Amino acid sequence: RHPHVFGDGTAATVSQVRAAWQTIKQQEKPARASQLEGIPKALPELARAARLSSRAALVGYDFPDRLMLFEKLREELGELAVELFGTPELPVVIPSAETAAVPDEPWTDAARRERAESELGDVLFAVANIARRWGINPEEALRKTNARFTRRFQAIETAVRESGRTLQQVSLPEMESIYQAYKRREQGRADASADTQ
């Protein structure tokens, strides 16, 4: 399968090597009905999205410039905003006592909720595609973010408990202040660790 190394083939670029590799693999394997066959449905969905877009890219269905993926993400966020807010413009929210007291609206229109879910799926697919193009595992990125959030939220719980109060007795701005302080401490430890290496 490596004619550019062991045979008569030549390949000047990495993309030419990959294209030749795919051609040889397709000749050796039975024909697939779809380029997307063989991607396990049991994969976590972010990983599956990255794999689907990777397979499509192998046959040229990809943005020629990876920066275009951010424009696609903006487009998808705009479409989600239309379903959520009735406008493609993302709202700018300035926190205040009034906005903090407004409860989330329950979905009253099932069709609109379904469209919003579809648009959110498109946003997540675009994010997985960005991860793929930059060589980032989206599942690993999300796992690390979940772990960071857990540590930081638990820091809020600890600080509140040590103050003799419950979470329900603490304002959102105070909780956010504790969260951000813990985040700065974590980043300071990471910076100090990097300096010693």
Regions found by a protein language model. Give the residues of each.
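Flexible "arm" and connector segments at domain edges
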Residues: 1-120, 125-197
